[in-house]
């Protein structure tokens, strides 16, 4: 049984897509979220896909989030996709993320300190009909700011700097 207090979250977003010529597609997203006992969080994200050739696509992504009194996040990424055959695609990617740390409304919590992270990936995508399978390998590096709240030092091992290999497999079936 869940007891009070509850944390309710309400959010809304506006998303629009634009096609520029026959080789550029953009998508912009603006979102506002509100969690009980906190200020609104405003987020903006911009995605671009540029067809460099018939088989080579460059994708760019950038975003920002802001919540008073002191949370800010910035993120971005770039990937290059090459269509080897009509069913197979190879991607190289890089993502970067930075924030100032979690905002909390309570005294004792697991609020994360500021974070800088980066990920480098290579993936292969197989598509046929309404089915696709993607396998990827990457290197992920996270660098946390020091924990400054003495009540959160119990979580010091959770928020320590790490570098590790990531592996993902995703299966998608559209119907």
Annotated model-derived regions:
Residues 1-175:
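Gram-negative and organellar
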């Amino acid at each position: 049984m869940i007891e009070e207090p509850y944390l309710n979250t309400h959010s809304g977003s506006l998303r629009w897509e634009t096609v520029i010529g026959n080789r550029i597609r953009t998508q912009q997203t603006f979102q506002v979220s509100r969690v009980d006992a906190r200020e609104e969080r405003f987020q903006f994200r911009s995605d671009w896909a540029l067809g460099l050739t018939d088989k080579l696509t460059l994708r760019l992504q950038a975003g920002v989030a802001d919540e008073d009194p002191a949370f800010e996040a910035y993120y971005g990424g770039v990937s290059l996709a090459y269509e080897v055959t009509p069913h197979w695609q190879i991607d190289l990617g890089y993502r970067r993320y930075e924030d100032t740390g979690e905002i909390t409304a309570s005294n004792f919590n697991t609020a994360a300190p500021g974070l800088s992270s980066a990920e480098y990936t290579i993936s292969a995508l197989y598509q046929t009909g309404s089915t696709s399978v993607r396998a990827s390998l990457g290197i992920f590096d996270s660098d946390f700011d020091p924990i400054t709240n003495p009540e959160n030092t119990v979580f010091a091992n959770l928020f320590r700097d790490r570098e590790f290999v990531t592996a993902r497999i995703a299966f998608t079936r559209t119907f």
